[in-house]
Swiss-Prot record:
Reaction catalysed by this enzyme: 2-deoxy-D-ribose 5-phosphate = D-glyceraldehyde 3-phosphate + acetaldehyde
Official protein name in the record: Deoxyribose-phosphate aldolase 2
InterPro entries associated with the record: Aldolase_TIM, DeoC, DeoC/FbaB/LacD_aldolase, DeoC_typeI
Organism: Bacillus licheniformis (strain ATCC 14580 / DSM 13 / JCM 2505 / CCUG 7422 / NBRC 12200 / NCIMB 9375 / NCTC 10341 / NRRL NRS-1264 / Gibson 46)
Matching PANTHER family: DEOXYRIBOSE-PHOSPHATE ALDOLASE
SUPFAM superfamilies, alphabetized: Aldolase (SSF51569)
EC number per UniProt: 4.1.2.4
Subcellular localization, as worded in the UniProt entry: Cytoplasm
GO molecular function, one term: deoxyribose-phosphate aldolase activity
Length: 223
């Protein structure tokens, strides 16, 4: 297992063009990243390009705000899987969590887990930069209760990204059997090593190539 094998090689900007997605895929093949993480519109293309490889196709659900209806998130999940996605990163309903509506948050996550039906890993983005520590812990517990495979720090589209402290808190909360994905602002090999040492088992980054090559990450994206 190498650092590259832990990275979801990511391109989620709304103006990302086909040539850039093609480059992302070729880089994933060259460096053997865990997955490519793309917007839903690119899932079918990525799945076709990655056919015959062990690289997963990851996409995002209810992204980046998490404010879609539960029914929409479930449909997005089924549609993405039908088009070739093998991993989905969903955003929780952040407002519901802050309102203390835990039953709704858990049901929202569970709907995506059930829509995936063992065909795709489900990673739950809790958007740590918007939460108190108590809310982070509660979100993690709800994700575990709903049957998610991973908890994830950030979308990369809000006010902050992954921190070592948040990764450690999330790992402590979910225990050893659930994955923890760090994303948002990870640009160097040292960043990755810090996240892993605090409990991360997957890294989301658009600077994957510079991370594994040891070059200084110059990508200005937040994910």
């Amino acid at each position: 297992m190498t650092i590259a094998n832990l990275i979801d090689h990511t391109a989620l900007k709304p103006h990302t063009q086909k040539s850039e997605i093609k480059k992302l895929i070729e880089e994933a093949k060259a460096y053997q990243f865990a997955s490519v993480c793309v917007n839903p519109t690119w899932v079918e293309f990525a799945a076709e390009e990655l056919k015959g490889t062990e690289i997963d196709v990851c996409t995002v659900i209810g992204f980046p705000l998490g404010a879609n209806t539960t029914e929409t998130k479930a449909f997005e999940t089924k549609d993405a899987i039908a088009k070739g996605a093998t991993e989905v990163d969903m955003v929780i309903n952040i407002a519901a969590l802050k309102d203390g509506n835990d039953d709704f948050v858990e049901a929202d996550i569970r709907a995506v887990v059930e829509a995936a039906k063992g065909k795709a890993l489900v990673k739950v983005i809790i958007e740590t930069c918007l939460l108190t520590d108590e809310e982070k812990e509660r979100a993690c517990r709800l994700a575990v209760a709903a049957g998610a495979d991973f908890v994830k720090t950030s979308t990369g589209f809000s006010t902050g990204g992954a921190t070592a402290e948040d990764i450690a808190l999330m790992r402590k909360t979910v225990g050893p059997d659930i994955g923890v994905k760090a994303s948002g602002g990870i640009r160097t090999k040292e960043d990755v090593e810090t996240m892993i040492s605090n409990g991360a088992t997957r890294i989301g980054a658009s600077a994957g190539v510079s991370i594994v090559s040891g070059a200084e990450g110059k990508n200005e994206d937040n994910y």
